[in-house]
Amino acid sequence: PDDEVASRNLLSEWIEILERDRNHPSIITWAPLTVPLSNVTSGTFARLVFDLQKLTKAIDPSRPFNDLTGSGFHFLTDIWSISTYEPDATRFALSLKPDKNQAAYANQPFIIGEFGGIVWETSRTKEDTWGHGGTFTNEDALFERIEKLINAIQSSGIISGFCYTQFSDIEQEKNGIYTYDRQPKFDMERIRSIFKKIPSKPIKK
């Protein structure tokens, strides 16, 4: 959206979306933009983000606004979110903080919108297997990877919540803990014992 006309069109469409969906009970946060591919520091893009926030709060002040979900680059947001598929637990832990070169962090809830993406490969899925965070054929090694990532989140001291990628396989991605038709892939009690760990408390203001 470095294009002025495209930005104005998006704002008009966004108003229609807000008015159509603001009473829908499943919507918990407004997130109009995701990881940007354009120049986020341009004046046109920055103005678009601020206009989206102003419109959203005017039409529905009851919900949080997340300006650039998952990007870690924020202008004006109620929720600070990042997405990372870093597989190494040590490097993953280091990424769980606001980047000092980005917008000033103002103690918003810090959310990991996406992480994990680990593929469980079987002979049946080998020809059609893809994911974000590496491929495993050894179940114990896969559980170890997941648990190390969860431990890093738990000990971060800043994370308010997280979303693992992902609940179930989809057409092109085989990194779910359930299959496409919602059948468990693993010992779900073992999965539960990892994911039930309580995230760390957010930083106090």
PLM region spans:
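Substrate-binding/catalytic cleft of secreted carbohydrate-active enzymes
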Residues: P1-R182, R190, F195
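Histidine-centered active-site microenvironments of extracellular/periplasmic hydrolases
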Residues: F186
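Surface beta-strand/loop "capping" patches
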Residues: S193-K205
